[in-house]
């Protein structure tokens, strides 16, 4: 774990060169898809991570696991991965099956140093990973059209770092970015398929519910 902010940024800059951006990634509706998410108990400096593996075609749960860890890095925007990565890795490593494509509640390329949680996790595991976030972080975008599937580029200046994707008619968009070993078109296609009933992908919804439940149990 980095000793401070400067060291953490140096780690990001070093690992960023290992991100693979020229693979399309697994096709939607096939294989397995895994949602990862975390929940915090700030008073006790505890973080709980959950990983939920779904069948990519049926959305049935194939496997799920949780891990409990200590928060050992301060809250610094742009460096949140260092608070989450150790516990998320522990959850993924305890899965009894290959996770397939991993979906993070966060960012990949849509990050000031182009190395958010989804990219960090992808480089460390070698897995294809995408980020699907609830807000645009520091980036700009125009509202996509009102219909499900409409999208607009998420921009840092003139560089497209992700997309604002409307997953439900008339509902706020989510913000999709590539993490590792997956293209942006494919990342959006996966997100849209997984968000068939709600704004958030089913993977994220399941992982969020599981980590919150595990945090309550850990605090009991």
Annotate each PLM feature.
Residues 102, 138, 142-143:
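Feature detects long, helix-prone N-terminal segments enriched in hydrophobes
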Residues 107-108, 134-137:
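Short, ordered loop/turn segments at secondary-structure junctions
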Residues 1-22, 85, 134-135, 143-220:
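C-terminal binding/interaction regions
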Residues 74-79, 104-112, 171-178:
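Flexible, glycine/proline-enriched loop segments at strand-loop-helix junctions
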Residues 88-121, 125-127:
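Catalytic-site beta-strand/loop segments enriched in glycine and acidic/polar residues
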Residues 31-41:
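Two-metal-ion RNase H-like nuclease active-site motif
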Residues 43-98:
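A glycine-rich, hydrophobic loop/mini-helix early in the fold
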Residues 128-133:
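Short hydrophobic alpha-helical runs that function as membrane-insertion/retention elements
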């Amino acid at each position: 774990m980095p000793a401070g902010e400067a060291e953490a940024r140096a780690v990001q800059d070093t690992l960023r060169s290992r991100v693979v951006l020229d693979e399309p990634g697994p096709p939607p509706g096939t294989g397995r898809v895994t949602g990862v998410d975390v929940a915090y108990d700030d008073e006790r400096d505890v973080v709980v991570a959950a990983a939920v593996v779904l069948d990519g075609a049926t959305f049935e749960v194939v496997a799920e696991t949780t891990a409990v860890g200590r928060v050992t890095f301060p809250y610094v925007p742009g460096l949140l991965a260092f608070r989450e990565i150790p516990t998320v890795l522990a959850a993924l490593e305890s899965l009894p099956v290959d996770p397939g494509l991993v979906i993070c509640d966060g960012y990949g390329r849509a990050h000031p140093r182009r190395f958010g949680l989804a990219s960090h996790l992808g480089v460390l595991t070698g897995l294809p990973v995408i980020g699907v976030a609830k807000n645009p972080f520091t980036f700009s975008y125009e509202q996509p059209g009102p219909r499900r599937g409409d999208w607009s580029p998420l921009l840092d200046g003139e560089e497209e770092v992700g997309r604002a994707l409307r997953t439900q008619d008339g509902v706020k968009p989510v913000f999709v970015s590539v993490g590792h070993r997956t293209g942006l078109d494919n990342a959006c296609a996966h997100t849209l398929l997984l968000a068939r009933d709600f704004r958030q992908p089913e993977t994220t919804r399941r992982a969020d519910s599981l980590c919150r439940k595990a945090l309550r149990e850990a605090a009991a």
